Amino acid sequence: MGKTVLARSRKEGYVPLLYPPYGSILADVHDQALSAAETGRGGIKKMENAIKRNMSSEGFTAKKLAFIGLFGAVASVLMFLEFPLPFAPGFYKLDLSEVPVLIGAFALGPVSGFFIELIKILVHLVIKGTQTAGIGELANLVIGCAFVLPAALIYRAGKTRKRAVIGMITGTLVMTVAGCFMNAFVLLPAYATAFGMPMETLVGMGTAVNKAVHDVLTFAVLCVAPFNLVKGIVVSLITFFLYKHISTLIKSV
């Protein structure tokens, strides 16, 4: 339990707090409740409204936190359902874990989308561990955010189907560019260092599926870019058809 302290409200009195960061909020509620009680009518209702206003100002309600956890858990499960694509090396596998992340980001906001993405990675790490020295998980987090956050920010500016489509197209393009950059300059060198293999070996895996791949740049353009484009399109289509039904369910809870 947190240490109980006393915080002075704006009126002459003290209110008990569990911990200091919420002192001003509880003091505000205390003062508003006293004022409501002094009127003699509607005091309880005004006190409830005061609590709701101050809770909403914190940004994360209990309902929102519950949905963030739920979407993160579903996304982590979907990470186990993965399959390779014929034009990418075997260590690139497509999964649908970004679907609940994107739906959650549309419904709850881009910040919530980031936390759903983070929970997805952490839960998956706890359950399965890492086979890539954490590099694959970091890549999933960064590139996933590159897809979800632009889409959610655009949709948040005007919640229409048109905005959703524009957001998902933008997110797909940003993810594709970010994926190429990250793989060419960060992830592939990190893989090579972590597993003690030359870059030529990794590039050779790309050459095995596409003869035009002969260096890191062509690997990124001919293997990574198509992979992320396909992933963005598939996730966007599924989200487009599911979102309305799931958002209605969220609002009804």
Describe every region a protein language model picked out:
Residues 14-26, 30-33, 38-253:
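Loop-helix junctions at membrane interfaces
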